Amino acid sequence: MSEPFILTITNAVATISINDAPHNRMMLDYIDALEEELPRLRDDERVRALVFTAEGLEHFSVGMNLKQFGEGAERKGGADGLLDQRLRVLNMIETLGKPSIATLFGYCLGGG
């Protein structure tokens, strides 16, 4: 499998691009990687803003990969553990202290 997202930093803007075209499902490794990367971006003085986008031309995201939900729930200590992680990641984005922008197109489904 390819990397869950592509991260670039240009002119003080970090761009995180979901890398699962054409549907850009929220895979477990995407959430894990975001949880790991967001604190680094928060602390990186070169980064003044974040842009969330997605690869391909069809959809920003069709939401969570439901085929992975059972596996993820087991790995995270049940469905509540999996959903708690997603909430932590959303809270990290909200409290990052840097503006974040999402460039949405096509379907944009999910919780948050």
Which residues make up each language-model segment?
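Conserved CoA-thioester-binding segment of acyl-CoA-metabolizing enzymes
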Residues: 1-53, 57, 91
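Short, histidine-centered active-site or binding-site loop motifs used for metal coordination
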Residues: 18-22, 73, 104
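Residues at alpha-helix caps and immediate loop-helix transition turns in enzyme cores, especially N-
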Residues: 26-30, 62, 112
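Structured helix-beta-strand junction loops
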Residues: 44, 72, 96-99
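Glycine- (often His-adjacent) and acidic-residue-rich active-site loop
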Residues: 54-92, 108
